[in-house]
Design a protein with these regions (language model features):
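Conserved catalytic network of the ASCE P-loop NTPase/AAA+ motor domain
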Residues: 36-40, 58-64
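Conserved nucleotide-binding/hydrolysis micro-motifs of P-loop NTPases
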Residues: 51-53, 71-77, 134
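Short glycine-/polar-rich loops that comprise or flank the Walker A/P-loop
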Residues: 61-66, 123-125
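A glycine- and Lys/Arg-enriched "phosphate-lid" helix/loop adjacent to the NTP-binding pocket
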Residues: 64-112
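Alpha-helix-centered segments that form part of catalytic cores
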Residues: 19-33, 100-118
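Generic beta-sheet signal
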Residues: 43-47, 65
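Conserved nucleotide-sensing/catalytic segment adjacent to the nucleotide-binding pocket
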Residues: 1-44
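NTP-dependent small-molecule kinase module
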Residues: 111-149
Length: 149
């Protein structure tokens, strides 16, 4: 049975939202791999997305330095949502309590980010924490350094 918008975004705990969100479980990861394998390997291929879970990516790497996870701080994520409050976020407006729905979503995302961090650390994969004080140029420099570019 499908949930209505309040059941999905307002009335559930963010932890329950995280545990039941299928994309955070690697669903469709194999389709991403198929797409990436069709791309030319030169000069470089950068792949991003929350379906790229460290435990799924690591076995595909020749060396662990080929991958890095950019992990937003909760403050960065909030700033991005505030700056992009666009139709993309319109689904929260379809709830009876848009602010709570958005808060739940942000909390779920923060828990997911923490899970990614812990998994990457356990697997000895690189991460960069991204906060709202970091410039695009600084982030690009740090990514290039981490990837040895």
């Amino acid at each position: 049975m499908a949930m209505d918008m309040d059941q999905r975004w307002v009335n559930r705990l963010p932890a329950d939202m995280l545990e039941t969100f299928h994309w955070f479980r690697g669903e469709c990861f194999s389709l991403i791999v198929e797409d990436v394998l069709r791309l030319p390997s030169e000069p470089y291929v950068i792949v991003e997305g929350f379906r790229l879970l460290p435990h799924l990516v690591k076995p595909l790497l020749a060396v662990s330095s080929q991958a890095i996870w950019l992990l937003p701080t909760p403050e960065f994520r909030q700033a991005m949502v505030n700056s992009r409050r666009s139709p993309q976020w319109g689904f929260v407006e379809k709830t009876s309590d848009p602010e709570r729905a958005l808060g739940n979503l942000l909390e779920r995302d923060a828990m997911f980010t923490q899970r990614l961090y812990e998994e990457a650390q356990r697997l000895e994969l690189k991460t960069i924490e991204v906060d709202s004080t970091m410039t695009v140029d600084e982030l690009a420099r740090r990514v290039a350094e981490a990837l040895g570019l």
